[in-house]
Amino acid sequence: VAGKTEEVEKFVEFVTNKDFVKKGDEYSIFKNLMPMPEELEGTTSPSKTINKELIEKYGSDNWYDWCYKNWGTKWGDYDTSKSELMKSGSNENESYVHFYYDTAWGPGSDELSILLCNQFPNLNFNLYYEEPGMSFAGQLTINKGEVIGDDNWELHQNNDDISEIEFNK
C-alpha cells in the first residue's frame, strides 16, 4: 500500500482491529472493507432449513456461502500482519506499508478490489498472491482508484516460491 503518508496511515487505521484477542487478529482487511452481516455469524453451512428472509436480505442464509460469494474465500484474511511504515525515497510525504495475510483458496473477490478503489482512491495497491497447493499465483495492481493490472499464472514444479516470479513494477 503506497501513497501520501497521511492516506497510508488512514488505511492502516481502517484495517486495525481495536479489540483483537489473539496475535494474528490485529488487522483484518476483508472484514473491515466488507463486514459479514451479524445475523449470519454462527450459522451452519449448509443451512438445516432455508431462511428465505436472510437469502433476500443478504443473498445467503449462512456464513460460508456469504463469505465465498462476497470475499471469494471462506474465512477472509487471517494471520494478517504488516511491516513498519516506510518512507518512499526522498519524498517525506510519501510512504508505503506491506501487509501479509493468508486466505483459504484464493486472493479475494473482485468486489473487494472495487471497494479498495472506491474507499481509498488516492492510494496504490500491489496485491500478490500464490496458492502452491493448487499451482497458481497472481498480481492485482491498483493505481489511485483504478485497476491497471490483473495477471494470474500457473506455478510450475520448478517455481517453488512466489519470490522466484518476476512481478510487474
Residue ranges and their predicted role:
Residues 1-169:
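Intrinsic low-complexity, intrinsically disordered or marginally ordered coil/linker segments
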